[in-house]
Curated annotation (Swiss-Prot):
Keywords: Metal-binding, NAD, Oxidoreductase, Zinc. NCBIfam families: PRK09422.1. Zn(2+) 1 binds at C37, H58, C145. Its cofactor is Zn(2+). Coiled coil: none annotated. SMART domains: PKS_ER. The keyword Hydrolase does not apply. It comes from the Bacteria. Belongs to the zinc-containing alcohol dehydrogenase family. InterPro entries: ADH-like_C (IPR013149), ADH-like_N (IPR013154), ADH_Zn_CS (IPR002328), D-isomer_DH_CS1 (IPR029752), GroES-like_sf (IPR011032), NAD(P)-bd_dom_sf (IPR036291), PKS_ER (IPR020843). Its EC number is 1.1.1.1. It catalyses: a primary alcohol + NAD(+) = an aldehyde + NADH + H(+); a secondary alcohol + NAD(+) = a ketone + NADH + H(+). This is Alcohol dehydrogenase.
Amino acid sequence: MKAAVVTKDHRVSIEEKRLRELKPGEALVKTEYCGVCHTDLHVKNADFGDVTGVTLGHEGIGRVIEVADNVDSLKVGDRVSIAWMYAACGNCEYCTTGRETLCRDVLNAGYTVDGAMAEEVIVDANYAVKVPENLDPAAASSITCAGVTTYKAVKVSGIEPGQWLGVFGVGGLGNLALQYAKNVMGAKVVAFDINDDKLNFAKELGADAIINSTNVDPIEEVNRLTNNKGLDATVITAVAKTPFNQAVDVVKAGARVVAVGLPVDKMDLDIPRLVLDGIEVVGSLVGTRQDLREAFQFAAENKVIPKVQLRQLSEINDIFDEMEKGTITGRMVIDMKSSH
């Protein structure tokens, strides 16, 4: 079968791979679609360590074509996800308290185990979440990582109906965060970016305000919008240091700043302001299986509609080049069916 494999020179090669036999608790999935995530770029570039030889992909959607004898959670024909959280231990302090993404023994698709940029993929049957049949599978691929990541981040922000949430970076993740915040949580949303095309798209999606922080002072604009109160919370999906710092600067006392994007950098924090204004800065890592079920359902109800562009597996290096240049709007999704 064809698979997108990380090479030593930080590129991706389309290679023929043979899968092993299923082990107890596993299922075999024929991949339909796989989204391309910024984390895939980090993995390819060895930002988290050298994983040469691994098959990329953690935004996979496909149909189960075989299950191991002892599997009863899935059956042949089910449409399921192949997500970043491939499997966890199920027994640690994190797994038993609803924080399974923090499990120290977690396995990650497309990083520590082979992922979904392949014609077929082996999954842990207990961690492959079923996809609603009325949800377009190409759109579902974006929900599998980008969607659940931003949905969870918006939940972590604690935003309530009518409050102001700032979304920093409104590309593939940010435009989904905007939709979950506005259409599910009932928040008012300010979109921040330095790309006018992305900001205009955010406006089309319902952003209450858009701010290009290279043209105006974001603090002044937020003060104007909120009568000098500041935002109730911010979510950062951008992958640069500046928006992380700005996301702290524009919030009110008692606000929460949620970090999602993964720039290889450090934040500058004004410690007296954090203490005196009671500002919380927290990280949010993807989402649990239950978060993913909820994220899928809201998408199935058309409350969140990912903007996807279908590409071919052979274009994977071109997609990464575009990603590094910052020219992508929405989500790039590889049509794996065309490679079968």
